[in-house]
């Protein structure tokens, strides 16, 4: 089952010729979701071929570089005769402000746009085999991050062991893998735990939006396959990072290390690094044992299962 992240906007508050403002597109099989929607996001979606068929948009906070692309995107969806509803999620208490922006700049789209308030710890999406959970972050506006967390998968079926126990190839294999005991012709009962391994973890992708480093992020991002973290500045601007409620690359790397994340994507890169983000990447590499990288706009990352 595919899980893929496309970085649509990786710049800080100011866009550059190389990087747009904040937006991340996530596709999990047929589910398409957008995390933040900075100015120009719809053009990035056109450039990088994601399409507009998103069903949900998760907004971390209501600063312009995270929301000003939403009215234009909704207007284009409307021009394209969209009928399917769009659910938009914002920090609790901010619904009216976002609705005002939509109504003022996009008019009233002809398709349903549901604006929902979200609180820390809330399960925003509860699907059959994954959920999206909100968590509080530390910025100078009410802000949330979001984590996509897949359910555990069945353990591996040990065909060789099943055959040793006398289980005939066929439907009984499927029954055992589904967690059902089976009875053989001689009356022997084979239990699933005899031939099925321990449950295997699903995947986890965590997006912080703008934030200072927090213990809450460490908890949510534990064993994350991909942590997408604010890394606006390098350490030589640590005071500015603290003053503006952002993180340095080293701070993001420390969070990823403490969470034992597998990969760290450094985003919301200040325009001062527009020509050369290597100080950000190098700083994170020095502090994080996993893979740390500064994605370019348009980069797509496939998320394999942890045991692959």
From Swiss-Prot:
<keyword id="KW-0378">Hydrolase</keyword>
<feature type="binding site">
    <location>
        <position position="210"/>
    </location>
    <ligand>
        <name>Zn(2+) 1</name>
    </ligand>
</feature>
<keyword id="KW-0819">tRNA processing</keyword>
<dbReference type="Pfam" id="PF00753">
    <property type="entry name" value="Lactamase_B"/>
</dbReference>
<dbReference type="GO" id="GO:0042781">
    <property type="term" value="F:3'-tRNA processing endoribonuclease activity"/>
</dbReference>
<dbReference type="GO" id="GO:0008270">
    <property type="term" value="F:zinc ion binding"/>
</dbReference>
<keyword id="KW-0255">Endonuclease</keyword>
<feature type="binding site">
    <location>
        <position position="268"/>
    </location>
    <ligand>
        <name>Zn(2+) 2</name>
    </ligand>
</feature>
<comment type="similarity">
    <text>Belongs to the RNase Z family.</text>
</comment>
<dbReference type="InterPro" id="IPR013471">
    <property type="entry name" value="RNase_Z/BN"/>
</dbReference>
<protein>
    <recommendedName>
        <fullName>Ribonuclease Z</fullName>
        <ecNumber>3.1.26.11</ecNumber>
    </recommendedName>
</protein>
<keyword id="KW-0479">Metal-binding</keyword>
<dbReference type="InterPro" id="IPR001279">
    <property type="entry name" value="Metallo-B-lactamas"/>
</dbReference>
<feature type="binding site">
    <location>
        <position position="61"/>
    </location>
    <ligand>
        <name>Zn(2+) 1</name>
    </ligand>
</feature>
<feature type="binding site">
    <location>
        <position position="66"/>
    </location>
    <ligand>
        <name>Zn(2+) 2</name>
    </ligand>
</feature>
<feature type="binding site">
    <location>
        <position position="139"/>
    </location>
    <ligand>
        <name>Zn(2+) 1</name>
    </ligand>
</feature>
<feature type="binding site">
    <location>
        <position position="210"/>
    </location>
    <ligand>
        <name>Zn(2+) 2</name>
    </ligand>
</feature>
<feature type="active site" description="Proton acceptor">
    <location>
        <position position="65"/>
    </location>
</feature>
<feature type="binding site">
    <location>
        <position position="65"/>
    </location>
    <ligand>
        <name>Zn(2+) 2</name>
    </ligand>
</feature>
<keyword id="KW-0540">Nuclease</keyword>
<feature type="binding site">
    <location>
        <position position="63"/>
    </location>
    <ligand>
        <name>Zn(2+) 1</name>
    </ligand>
</feature>
<dbReference type="InterPro" id="IPR036866">
    <property type="entry name" value="RibonucZ/Hydroxyglut_hydro"/>
</dbReference>
<keyword id="KW-0862">Zinc</keyword>
<comment type="subunit">
    <text>Homodimer.</text>
</comment>
<comment type="function">
    <text>Zinc phosphodiesterase, which displays some tRNA 3'-processing endonuclease activity. Probably involved in tRNA maturation, by removing a 3'-trailer from precursor tRNA.</text>
</comment>
